Amino acid sequence: MDFIFHYQSSWLIPMLPFLSAFVAGFGLISFRLPTRSLRHLYGLISTITVFFSMIISMNLLWKYIIGHSNYCFLFPWIVNDNISLKLGFFIDPLSSLMLFLVTSVAVLVMSYSHGYMSHDQSYVRFFAYLSLFTASMLGLVLSPNLFQIYIFWELVGMCSYLLIGFWFTRPNAASACQKAFITNRIGDFCLLLGILGLYWFTNSFDFITVTKRTEEIISNNNSHLYFFIFCSFLLFCGPIAKSAQFPLHIWLPDAMEGPTPISALIHAATMVAAGIFLVARLFPLFQLFPSIMNLITCIGILTAFLGSTIALSQIDLKKSLAYSTISQLGYMMVAMGIGSYKAGLFHLVTHAYSKALLFLGSGSVIHNLEPLLGYNPENNQNLVFMGGLGKSMPITRFTFLIGTLSLCGVPPFACFWSKDEIIADAWKYNFNLGLIAWITAGLTGFYMFRVYLLAFEGDFRGIIFLNKNNLKSTKEVHESNLYMLIPLIILSFLSLFIGFISTPFHDYLYIFLDSPIVYDNETSYFQILLNFSSIGVALIGMIIAYSIYAYNNISIDFGFFKRSLKKIYFEFYQFSFSKWYIEVFYHSLFLSGTRNLAQLLFYLDQWLFDGVVNLTGISTLLGGQSLKYKESGRVSSYLFSILIGALVLFFFLPLHNSQIGSN
């Protein structure tokens, strides 16, 4: 038992869910019918293995809380005169915190999935993918170098592709998983180039060694500065894609085509968290280059504002939460870019539990609307057809409200402490940056409370859908089963209390992380006023949402802005609903542009290249056809041709010789 809770047993944390995935996958391939008959057993095994991983992670976290030092274990994999590749695991405060975060969310998601996916024919395949996804993220967190982190980085991307396209018979799901995979290919390729570029100069993949040697090389030879800046930019492109930052954010909303438990895991603790984790892991390297830190800040604040403005007008429940995730990830990037390392990780933790709660709550709503509105996501996820669900789903409503208040930044819920700290640090760093972050907080309050009101308050509007399609249903919406409710209740407590690990009164997280940034703890009255103003602007956004959607939302057809507000507001609504026309631009540039280029190349190939080849053959054919008539067999014709040739030579040669003589 002592070995299990020792540092050297850390490899068990990713290995247990990996073995669970292997057993389920092997069973599906080799013993399909027996495996399907034991489907619930496989689901239970998957949950138990991740639960044991969580217990080991909790033990490691506790060891660091009481003051243990870092631990690294490496063994050589490929060693020769030219290259040395090592694998292993690295335990420090950052990895121990992330291990507990990933495993705790994964256990709750798997427990929830027993109820949500119970009737799905591919139940075992779902848990196999889910276990592999969790194992890949845990392996990424434990990676001691860039080489190993890239291996698990790719595995995380592959698992997201499999899970987003889990219902691959749906055209939208098949398209969404391809979109996610291709978009992330851009970031992954840049990340690979950045890793290879740094290895070329530093001859190492180790995080600490790469940072130290980079600093030494730059201090000794400043001519290599721009090369290292470029490599750092390439490294950052990986998190841009993985964490859905502008301009590679377009895949995340479409990823909602996957099962809702997967959406919760992707948005809370795996896929998008991987990008933030990599920035945190490479934070000392990025700090060497102020231009890279400024780029991280600019990308982050633009993404935060973009995500919040698009979320204002979305009518799909899960996509509204997806754009919320994009916005909150932007906040985390802002924190990293301005040097607020601890605040960024703090918001990663608080947002993970709050967003997992919101997605699992939305899954509870969708799961109970499917028998009534059908299994088409355009109907059962449409906020237009919801409303009044709080009457029949009180526990789901209450837990969803807790997640909403947390994400809005209402004290004392978890996200209040983390988001407020990021906004405060943004004000300190730059006034304009703080202003945009502050406005984004107000928008967050509006769109999150709007989602809650449209889903749970007022009267049930699903009758509109039923009447429109001449359908009658005797089924009623009811509360979810205990498999789904217990994770919601646990996440509600976490969303309420997890924020107290880092407060202005005592910052336990700062002490635990041993943050590389020294903070100015002096707080002015102006700073306190700014902190309270962020709460105020969030409340203003919530009040505006309440005034619009709380009372007469049964008659809302989302033409409100067009009918009752000025044209400029309607145009802003259209701008938001059209997602800033970014996807329209991408479609015109890449999809239509590629098709037009292919069409142009087709015509060039057909008429120019093939034309030259075909012209050679045709000209030879015509020449042969014309010459065959001259081969008549008559001697007089041949003599006439010889005479003509002789006359030409007789007159041409003297003329040519005279020109040569004059020269």
Curated annotation (Swiss-Prot):
Its EC number is 7.1.1.-. It comes from the Eukaryota. It is found in: Plastid, Chloroplast thylakoid membrane. GO terms for molecular function: NADH dehydrogenase (ubiquinone) activity; quinone binding. InterPro entries: NADH_UbQ_OxRdtase_chlpt_su5_C (IPR002128), NADHpl_OxRdtase_5_subgr (IPR018393), ND/Mrp_TM (IPR001750), NU5C-like (IPR003945), Proton_antipo_N (IPR001516). Its main location: plastid. One of its GO terms (cellular component) is chloroplast thylakoid membrane. Keywords: Chloroplast, Membrane, NAD, NADP, Plastid, Plastoquinone, Quinone, Thylakoid, Translocase, Transmembrane, Transmembrane helix, Transport. It holds the Pfam family Proton_antipo_C. The keyword Translocase applies. It is a multi-pass membrane protein. It catalyses: a plastoquinone + NADH + (n+1) H(+)(in) = a plastoquinol + NAD(+) + n H(+)(out); a plastoquinone + NADPH + (n+1) H(+)(in) = a plastoquinol + NADP(+) + n H(+)(out). The chain crosses the membrane at residues 11-31, 41-61, 89-109, 126-146, 149-169, 189-209, 224-244, 260-280, 292-312, 329-349, 398-418, 436-456, 482-502, 528-548, 607-627, 635-655. GO terms for biological process: ATP synthesis coupled electron transport; electron transport coupled proton transport. It is an enzyme of class 7 (translocase). PANTHER family: NADH-UBIQUINONE OXIDOREDUCTASE CHAIN 5 (PTHR42829:SF2). NDH is composed of at least 16 different subunits, 5 of which are encoded in the nucleus. Belongs to the complex I subunit 5 family. NDH shuttles electrons from NAD(P)H:plastoquinone, via FMN and iron-sulfur (Fe-S) centers, to quinones in the photosynthetic chain and possibly in a chloroplast respiratory chain. The immediate electron acceptor for the enzyme in this species is believed to be plastoquinone. Couples the redox reaction to proton translocation, and thus conserves the redox energy in a proton gradient. This is NAD(P)H-quinone oxidoreductase subunit 5, chloroplastic. The lineage of its organism: Eukaryota, Viridiplantae, Streptophyta, Charophyceae, Charales. The gene is ndhF.
